[in-house]
């Protein structure tokens, strides 16, 4: 049992550790399945299902209709065959980084570490990317910090429900696209997008939702797994 309760006020009382203030410079890494299409940005998995978006049109022209080639079909193509954790760590050390933060799971639901909670982490590169990088960083006295964007997965690819795509009407638990709930308002596509009035920054991921307890249990389990591993 920790020092926090399930309120924004309690969570806002959290203070950053001293080492973080002292570190001055760190590197935040976005790398995952979305690097296969390498178009737009790391929101490709959402934008390819939004009619009228540049990624939607690019996807059809490059890979075919979303019904025939969906986001999940990129996973076998994400091999990461040139990934070398030691080489990365050497580069970060030369750059002067004191901490490195890879995204363990982005909004797309693909885990970049060896997870026991999802079959998808056993596909693609079939490597514990975060774990291997963490081992090399430790040898160089660089702090490994990890980011999880799982919470946004609740609604992230819901655009696929609005037309005939590879997303089934009933999405089973554990499926890459689960649960893809339609959001109550359109989320901004990237850090420069504007939020609706009254939605505090940092709370936009779940604002306006009556979030499914099953999803929150799944989110908590994945979060704890990242910490434990």
Features from the language model and the residues they span:
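Mature catalytic domains of secreted/periplasmic carbohydrate-active enzymes
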Residues: 1-229
